[in-house]
């Protein structure tokens, strides 16, 4: 997979900053000079939230390929550091869902992410989970000096002192060799044993990549980042906090120009939940007909998927989802076309949604997909909240924005995404969708409310 033009520009921005950093030996001065060269000196105020550590941010909208950018950023950062530097990376993620997805892609030698890293580091790469690190699996003083070591970890597993967090602070005989080789730590972590995993990572002085970094700005998060003793911190987010040192901005227009996202979002309102259900089925079937025509013309396979955002009573109760499954089956949908994905039920585990053999066309959820789940085939978000309830779509909207095959399709309807709702306050729903777009790095210009009741698919790219 090649970098898109805007992604090449992001890596070029990082590389130029690193050149200035090596010239000035001052990360704040390098940041100021970088933005002076860009004729934007007002952006050059560096905010030193981690004293002594360069801390930069890529601002990239949802669907812009933040993970691939991070993979491409590792080599330039280490190239700018002394050649004797141990090549260790801590890759922090905010949720178990994103953790699972990131580990899977980085461990897969056939995945574009891993292939890029393998090319940059001569295939001398090892990717670790926290448990593998605690067990010392292929993790020892010799291996870390001979390879790039990527440790994929969740914020919570190091941010707190709960049962899971404590394991990283405790004496660990599996890592005793490190303590002998590395010696006394220069920056000891309070209450951490010298053989503790957290202390060992601290002494490796890693590059820290913070995915969805807007989640990592609490005092606990900053303490965690400090304890990692990073040599460099790279933040990735669509919505940076005001204290972020943004080194490269990606505009939504650039994503649209490179055919990365399905925009605009077409929003339909219906009088009843039952109408949302039936119209979602009709809309998805019509999209699948367009997808079949696209396949005949271009050979690119797409199987449009609809996400039903159910509204449970209180907690995510199984009865709500099973009732919706029954309603879909009563409407003629085969059982194998339906999957439930909630906090407690995961029928998508080990399912390859992009495979032509996969039958899934409808996914029932609440907010379990709000982070860490990506499927470009997801085209429709259908909210089944009560008419009087607020339609909480902003957290899950980003799941339907990625464009399959990252190319413009000949069928215009396949280049857009769709939301159906039965809200009594349609304007409020639209504003929530706009908020969701803002959270993903887009704007209200990317939302198209449709007032007419007849369900029609766009026939051209201008809606």
Give short role names for the model-derived ranges.
Residues 69-83:
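Walker A/P-loop NTP-binding motif
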Residues 1-56:
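Conserved pre-motif I regulatory segment
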Residues 212-214, 369:
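Conserved Walker B
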Residues 8, 12-14, 79-80, 100, ...:
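Helicase-associated low-complexity regulatory tails and linkers flanking the ATPase motor
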Residues 52-56, 87, 360:
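Pre-Walker A (Motif I) flank of P-loop NTPase domains
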Residues 373-386:
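A short beta-strand element within the Helicase C-terminal
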Residues 52-72:
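Walker A/P-loop
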Residues 87-109:
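Conserved Walker A/P-loop ATP-binding site and its immediately adjacent core
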């Amino acid at each position: 997979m090649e970098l898109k033009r805007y992604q090449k520009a992001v890596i070029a921005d990082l590389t130029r900053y690193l050149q200035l950093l090596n010239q000035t030996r001052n990360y704040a001065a390098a940041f100021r000079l970088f933005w002076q060269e860009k004729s934007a000196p007002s952006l050059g105020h560096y905010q030193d939230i981690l004293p002594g550590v360069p801390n930069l941010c890529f601002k990239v909208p949802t669907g812009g390929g933040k993970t691939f950018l991070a993979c491409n950023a590792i080599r330039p950062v280490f190239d700018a550091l002394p050649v004797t530097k141990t090549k260790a990376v801590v890759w922090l993620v905010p949720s178990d869902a994103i953790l699972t997805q990131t580990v899977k892609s980085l461990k897969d030698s056939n995945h574009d992410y891993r292939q890029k890293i393998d090319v940059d580091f001569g295939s001398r790469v090892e990717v670790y989970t926290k448990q593998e690190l605690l067990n010392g699996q292929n993790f020892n003083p010799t291996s870390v000096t001979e390879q790039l070591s990527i440790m994929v970890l969740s914020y919570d597993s190091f941010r707190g002192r709960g049962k899971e967090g404590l394991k990283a602070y405790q004496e660990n005989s599996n890592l005793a060799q490190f303590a002998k080789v590395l010696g006394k730590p220069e920056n000891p972590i309070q209450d951490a044993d010298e053989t503790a995993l957290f202390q060992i990572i601290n002494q490796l002085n890693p590059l820290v990549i913070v995915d969805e970094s807007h989640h990592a700005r609490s005092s606990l998060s900053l303490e965690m980042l400090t304890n990692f003793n990073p040599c460099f911190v790279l933040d990735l987010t669509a919505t940076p906090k005001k204290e972020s040192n943004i080194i490269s901005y990606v505009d939504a227009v650039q994503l649209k120009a490179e055919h990365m996202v399905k925009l605009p979002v077409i929003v339909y309102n219906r009088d009843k939940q039952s109408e949302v259900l039936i119209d979602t089925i009709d809309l998805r079937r019509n999209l699948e007909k367009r997808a079949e025509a696209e396949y005949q013309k271009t050979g690119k396979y797409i199987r449009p998927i609809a996400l039903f955002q159910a509204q449970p009573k209180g907690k995510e109760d199984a009865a709500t989802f099973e009732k919706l499954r029954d309603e879909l089956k009563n409407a003629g949908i085969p059982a194998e076309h339906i999957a439930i994905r909630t906090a407690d039920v995961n029928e998508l585990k080990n399912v390859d949604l992009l495979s032509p053999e996969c039958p899934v066309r409808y996914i029932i959820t609440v907010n379990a997909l709000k982070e860490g789940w990506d499927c470009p085939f997801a085209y429709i978000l259908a909210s089944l909240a009560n008419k009087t309830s607020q339609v909480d779509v902003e957290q899950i909207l980003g799941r339907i924005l990625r464009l399959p095959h990252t190319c413009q399709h000949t069928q215009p309807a396949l280049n857009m995404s769709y939301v159906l709702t039965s809200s009594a306050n349609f304007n409020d729903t639209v504003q929530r969708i706009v908020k969701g777009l803002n959270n993903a790095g887009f704007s209200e210009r990317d939302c198209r409310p449709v007032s007419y009741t007849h369900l029609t698919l766009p026939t051209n790219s201008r809606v």
